[in-house]
Amino acid sequence: MSDVSTQSPKVGFVSLGCPKALVDSEQIITQLRAEGYEISGTYGGADLVVVNTCGFIDEAVQESLDAIGEALAENGKVIVTGCLGAKKDASGQDIITSVHPKVLAVTGPHALGEVMEAVHTHLPKPHDPFIDLVPPQGIKLTPKHYAYLKISEGCNHRCSFCIIPSMRGDLVSRPVAEVMLEAENLLKAGVKELLVISQDTSAYGVDVKFRMGFWNGRPLKTRMTELVGALGELASQYGAWVRLHYVYPYPSVDEVMPLMAEGKVLPYLDVPLQHAHPDVLKRMKRPANAEKTLDRIRAWREVCPELTIRSTFIAGFPGETEEEFQTLLDFIAEAELDRVGCFAYSPVEGATANDLPGALPDEVREERRARFMEVAERVSARGLQRKVGKSLRVLVDEVNQDGGIGRSSADAPEIDGLVYIAPPSKPYKRYKAGDFVSVKITGADGHDLWGEV
């Protein structure tokens, strides 16, 4: 539960799911505070509870249903929002209300207006709002030194394993000036790292035909390359980082490489490749193919040798043969992907992949995921070992009695590795959370680094 305090009436808040859902939660909490509601850190201290759910995979659905049940048991007045709110069961009934019929209201994701309307219905807003208590950057649920910057909502792809478009809709890009203003407010508030997120960052502006916008009196196209360039220029004025997530490997990404090579944005790409064998990609209804992607990765690294590539994959997709899986293992080794995650395929209710023949047993899916991660860890370990002896710029996330924990440009929060920093040997070398420090790397394993200032 999130804890921000001021005055009553009081709303409890539970936020589940991905960074896109976290941004939705931040927007709702910001509006609640602007209208004078207090955010309670406990169920018992709240007049009602809002639960922002995730509905992407079965485990997330169960976690969300459990959270709703806990909120109902502890408080009794619950409003539900998020991706699970848009899902229905096989009979066409809302999943949430079929399990928890006593919830006050249910909305889908990215539904600020509907959530606030439900709150107003069941907990009238105060007469005197406290909009002056809400900072220009809004209320954030991340640490003060980094923040997620969502540039669009929804997705135009129809991947067979995914139901996100049915929950979040087609691509809707935010106006470029609106994105830039939010970024500026975050940087002015002391944010040291902007994490650009969406369902498909490469497609930013496609829905508005790359419409020309304006920022600070200058024309700025609603397009990934132009937006990233402007964000990098803005962040450099504050000595901050810009990190790109959910970037499809389209040719347009080539245009961003010079910006990374020049240091305007971090040399880091989060590219969700999912597989490498063309037949599996076809069954997944995924764009691109492994050979072209491998050529593109090589070209990117020629322009930006320091580039870190993170990706996610699915092992054990329906119909995946041992030969197809071996192609995937060969690909991650040849591509030398720096950071990877792998999920054993799990059927998602409503996904068209459920109708594909050749479903694999659970033990085969898990065994392939484990084999994948063994190869991936060896690749990662080789790359991290090459960093030993080098000095890296590290953003400190926390400080404790054992020293500090931070991240290099190659590490996004929560999903990548960490840099463990020895306690400062001299007073002038002290650091705190949110500081950038130069760390000499003294050790590495398959995931993390160790070093000293």
From Swiss-Prot:
Location in the cell: Cytoplasm
Annotated MTTase N-terminal domain ranges read: 9-124
Q: What is its main location?
A: cytoplasm
Needed cofactors, names only, are: [4Fe-4S] cluster
Q: What is its EC number?
A: 2.8.4.4
Domain Radical SAM core: from-to ranges: 141-382
**Signal sequence annotation:** none
Q: Which PROSITE patterns match?
A: MTTASE_N (PS51449), MTTASE_RADICAL (PS01278), RADICAL_SAM (PS51918), TRAM (PS50926)
Q: Where does [4Fe-4S] cluster 2 bind?
A: C155, C159, C162
| Annotated GO MF terms | 4 iron, 4 sulfur cluster binding; aspartic acid methylthiotransferase activity; metal ion binding; protein methylthiotransferase activity
Q: Which GO terms describe its cellular component?
A: cytosol
Record flagged with keyword Metal-binding: yes
Instruction: Please share the entry's free-text remark on the cofactor.
Output: Binds 2 [4Fe-4S] clusters. One cluster is coordinated with 3 cysteines and an exchangeable S-adenosyl-L-methionine.
Q: Which residues form the TRAM domain?
A: 385-453
Q: Which GO terms describe its biological process?
A: tRNA modification
Question: Catalysed reaction per UniProt?
Answer: L-aspartate(89)-[ribosomal protein uS12]-hydrogen + (sulfur carrier)-SH + AH2 + 2 S-adenosyl-L-methionine = 3-methylsulfanyl-L-aspartate(89)-[ribosomal protein uS12]-hydrogen + (sulfur carrier)-H + 5'-deoxyadenosine + L-methionine + A + S-adenosyl-L-homocysteine + 2 H(+)
User: Keywords in UniProt for this one?
Assistant: 4Fe-4S, Cytoplasm, Iron, Iron-sulfur, Metal-binding, S-adenosyl-L-methionine, Transferase
Q: Which positions bind [4Fe-4S] cluster 1?
A: C18, C54, C83
Q: What is the protein's known function?
A: Catalyzes the methylthiolation of an aspartic acid residue of ribosomal protein uS12.
Family under the similarity heading: Belongs to the methylthiotransferase family. RimO subfamily.
Q: What is this protein called?
A: Ribosomal protein uS12 methylthiotransferase RimO
Organism (species): Ralstonia pickettii (strain 12J)
